[in-house]
């Protein structure tokens, strides 16, 4: 199975991607991860990407596509893969199609995990992380016994910059503006399937399998 997984930040996409990867025995390819890996290993493409990343700029499509292509050519992708974080734009989607056509492959399905913005806002802005041990709590769903204090090590809990309400709202805005055209693009190609994210991870997994036609 060759899958693309879409979902807003905080929609639980990573967790589902890991599950599907082990269920189908296909690699979970996170573009962010392979980009960082190339930078760390100082590959030619990694060096080029780093120049942009160091300036806080987006890495150009041609570099990202080349990095993704190299990853898709590895042996473990022969029987399928799960792409996460790519494509983000229609231009990238078209480039990916060309790459796959060269490899004699095509995308089977594009899975979109849908969670209402207000739900994501509640999930993310309620998260609290321990400064000492990194344990994660939630003011509504998993509150610490003592406010602001970690149950595990007694460390201080804090809210990450990424989880602040204004930041989350901005990230969601950017995500929708960028991804909506992509969702339409794959819908028109008859590849899009949608799973509605639930409160419980296991319930979301059920929705995901149903959307993919796997029980």
Swiss-Prot record:
Q: Does the keyword Kinase apply?
A: yes
Segments carrying the region annotation (NMP) are 30-59
Q: Which Pfam families does the UniProt entry name for this protein?
A: ADK, ADK_lid
Q: Which InterPro entries match?
A: Adenyl_kin_sub, Adenylat/UMP-CMP_kin, Adenylat_kinase_CS, Adenylate_kinase_lid-dom, P-loop_NTPase
Q: Which residues bind ATP?
A: 10-15, 127, 136-137, 199
Main location class: cytoplasm
Its annotated compartments are: Cytoplasm
Enzyme class, top EC level, equals transferase
Q: In which pathway does it act?
A: Purine metabolism; AMP biosynthesis via salvage pathway; AMP from ADP: step 1/1
Q: Where does AMP bind?
A: 31, 36, 57-59, 85-88, 92, 160, 171
Q: Which CDD domains match?
A: ADK (cd01428)
Q: What is known of its domains?
A: Consists of three domains, a large central CORE domain and two small peripheral domains, NMPbind and LID, which undergo movements during catalysis. The LID domain closes over the site of phosphoryl transfer upon ATP binding. Assembling and dissambling the active center during each catalytic cycle provides an effective means to prevent ATP hydrolysis. Some bacteria have evolved a zinc-coordinating structure that stabilizes the LID domain.
Q: What does this protein do?
A: Catalyzes the reversible transfer of the terminal phosphate group between ATP and AMP. Plays an important role in cellular energy homeostasis and in adenine nucleotide metabolism.
Q: Which PANTHER family match?
A: NUCLEOTIDE KINASE
Q: How does it assemble?
A: Monomer.
Recorded protein name is Adenylate kinase
Taxonomic source organism: Caldicellulosiruptor saccharolyticus (strain ATCC 43494 / DSM 8903 / Tp8T 6331)
* Top-level taxonomy: Bacteria, Bacillati, Bacillota, Bacillota incertae sedis, Caldicellulosiruptorales
Q: Identify the coding gene.
A: adk
